[in-house]
């Protein structure tokens, strides 16, 4: 079900699902993420968001995806808030994310939530924007 969603959602944003390479972690989400949520409309996944632990004080926002038909309804904001609240309640001090400069809507959402641009913190060769949110101040 998740893989079907990703096969539909990723191409909407110009990405391709690579389960044997950069997206292999989707085959073992419980090992890779500390939290992973799916948003449903009836029995269909329409959005996802996840949190990955970087260390005891830092986590990373991952896999914030929403089918295009569901954009503009506040659902992306709800998914983001779910992850941020989880990060706060789990005791993380900072939440990082990486993205693409072409993902204008996503970047606007992140900035509205309080994320600011930071230095590159990982080796993701597919990302060109790196952001951080101070969770201690986001409450």
Where on the chain are the PLM-derived regions?
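Acetyl-CoA-dependent GNAT
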Residues: 1-63, 67-68, 80-82, 86, ...
């Amino acid at each position: 079900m998740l893989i079907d969603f990703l096969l539909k959602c990723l191409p909407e944003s110009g990405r391709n699902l690579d389960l044997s390479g950069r997206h292999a972690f989707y085959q073992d989400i419980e090992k890779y993420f500390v939290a992973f949520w799916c948003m449903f409309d009836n029995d269909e996944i329409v959005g996802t968001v996840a949190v990955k632990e970087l260390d005891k004080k830092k986590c990373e926002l991952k896999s914030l995806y929403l089918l295009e038909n569901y954009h503009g309804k506040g659902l992306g904001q709800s998914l983001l808030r779910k992850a941020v609240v989880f990060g706060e309640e789990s005791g993380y001090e900072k939440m990082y994310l990486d993205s693409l400069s072409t993902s204008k809507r996503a970047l606007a959402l992140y900035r509205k939530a309080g994320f600011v641009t930071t230095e590159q913190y990982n080796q993701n060769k597919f990302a060109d924007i790196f952001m951080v949110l101070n969770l201690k101040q986001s409450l």
